[in-house]
């Protein structure tokens, strides 16, 4: 039995497809290094809607040991005028084996799909929203387990 979680790319795009850019590349790792911790702060892109600037930023904290749980934290910041309800942000992507995932920030919830270790997992519909100045801040949380490759 061997466990592999090879490197992969993660790209994201802003709401409505205004911008798309690669934001990070995950390094290869194996069970000898239990946890990969990658504190990131990305500005995924910004655009204007009715004169209001929308900014997508992603504090990303990835704990992705090949054996164990994986979690990714995302958030998005948008003007309150842009929504009739708090921002619901998340992303979907595939990690491992060089797969590329694309972010989906917008209404509803997205999930994380992991192919790197042979298992899929999706972000539960867990939101905790609060108002920060003129923006809504709503983190998304995802967890799952890598599978084993025999």
UniProtKB/Swiss-Prot annotation:
Keywords: Keratin. InterPro entries: KRTAP_PMG. Expressed at high levels in skin and at lower levels in the developing mammary gland. It comes from the Eukaryota. GO terms for cellular component: cytosol; intermediate filament. In the hair cortex, hair keratin intermediate filaments are embedded in an interfilamentous matrix, consisting of hair keratin-associated proteins (KRTAP), which are essential for the formation of a rigid and resistant hair shaft through their extensive disulfide bond cross-linking with abundant cysteine residues of hair keratins. The matrix proteins include the high-sulfur and high-glycine-tyrosine keratins. Belongs to the PMG family. Interacts with hair keratins. This is Keratin-associated protein 15-1. It comes from Mus musculus (Mouse). The lineage of its organism: Eukaryota, Metazoa, Chordata, Craniata, Vertebrata.
